[in-house]
């Protein structure tokens, strides 16, 4: 917490704000508040309204104006001007190809703007891949060759018809094999923070150890580590089939230990 005197005394301000910490935000999000996707929003619906918009004037305006609070300008201000963040990864939410709240072209333009402002490359990009819908795996080559993505991002509980997949099901394996072929061997996977009861099993981490063992040359970044909102996390329970325990069990069962190719993320949960 920054003390009040830091606003008045240079020494107090330096003590509160100075430092050599390296801050890497591994999951940033924003949307295009006026993009084509908004034309398909049902009347009266308020997508992304769960986001804290305190202090943003657009939050009080009618219709979808509040989406400006989670748009590009606010993202740049919050992350690169008003915080000590050094590097950020810009990620994507699951969507159909036609309904992306943020396109890769818009993300790339933002990364270029940040680089021009800062003089260094500070915004890294995911490439969104939902391999259980037509066209996404086929588009991976374009993403890798033209947009300098650092990793792929997928959501295993999501599907265009509500049905998810495991990473060692056919869609997941196609995605992994294409990532290997293209040389971008970092795959970020949303696990946990489930979307609802449908396809719930695919939100768990039971498949992670299996694919990590099968593909030791691929890095698997497990966003949220299987954490389930509303369920407590206590001492490790090998019988639990979801939550962080399921990730631990899957890794132990497949011999993935310290220094392996699975990275458990909890900071953005």
Q: What function would you assign to each model-found segment?
A:
Residues 9, 70-77, 107-112, 136-139, ...:
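Alpha-helical scaffolding within the catalytic cores
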Residues 17-18, 81-83, 118-119, 145, ...:
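Extracellular/periplasmic catalytic domains that process cell-envelope and extracellular macromolecules
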Residues 4-5, 87, 94-203, 268:
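Active-site gating/metal-coordination segments in enzymes
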Residues 1-91, 97-102:
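An N-terminally biased module of ancient metal coordination in phosphate/nucleic-acid-related enzymes
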Residues 29, 34, 93, 157, ...:
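Flexible loop residues that form catalytic
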